Design a protein with these regions (language model features):
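Beta-rich interaction/scaffold domains
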Residues: 1-207
Length: 207
């Protein structure tokens, strides 16, 4: 392998694919090699040629691609936040689905040989956004507390006209609980129910 052959191989590399620090190290070595091949061949020993080829190969071997840096960033973000172990059942399905999709996309790109830096950077951004947009569901305790409160109101205890008004709100709350809710939703529903209950009129004692 001659120094010229090695330089020709290096010339085919594209600067935009590599980190600037590692590219600079390679180019410094290339400059030395270019000076070296200008020398009179009669003055160059075989050992010097072997050493120069070796130095060029080492400088080429230390190149770090921008893609590998982006992959590492993405891997580190997933690992440090333990995203692959996250219990997505704790979150509203709509937000959990977006997150799962972003995580799957990121993991696919990490394994992909031909992933570009742009794709990887975009995947990281989407994953970060999806993580911050995850919204916790209300806990079972919070939902059950509201259901228990609802059970306390029985139609037989109140006048027909006041129950009729209350029942509209009661049914709205009941319908809302059929869907997923955040803690704030459950708190708001509880307040709405309590407010409506204040207008209930107890039936007179008929004994």
């Amino acid at each position: 392998q001659s120094v010229k052959d090695e330089l020709n191989t290096i010339n085919k590399l594209k600067e935009k694919d590599y980190t600037s620090e590692t590219w600079t190290i390679l180019q410094d070595q290339v400059k030395l090699a270019q000076e070296f091949i200008k020398k009179d061949e009669a003055t160059i020993t075989e050992k010097e040629v072997i050493d120069m080829v070796d130095a060029l190969q080492k400088a080429k071997a230390q190149l770090v691609t921008k893609v590998s840096v982006s992959k590492k960033e993405l891997k580190d973000y997933i690992a440090s936040n333990e995203l692959d172990k996250l219990d997505t059942n704790k979150y509203l399905t709509s937000t959990a689905d977006s997150f799962k999709k972003a995580l799957k996309n990121a993991q696919t790109l990490i394994e992909q040989e031909d992933a570009t830096k742009e794709q990887l950077d975009e995947a990281l951004k989407q994953l970060q956004d999806a993580r911050t947009q995850l919204v916790l569901k209300a806990t079972d305790d919070e939902v059950n507390a509201l259901k228990a409160l609802m059970d306390q109101y029985q139609e037989k205890d109140y006048t027909a006209s006041s129950w009729k008004e209350f029942e509209k709100v009661y049914n709205d709350v009941k319908d809302a609980l059929e869907n997923e809710n955040t803690s704030d939703n459950v708190q708001a529903l509880t307040n709405t129910l309590k407010e409506a209950a204040q207008k209930l009129v107890k039936r007179g004692n008929l004994d």
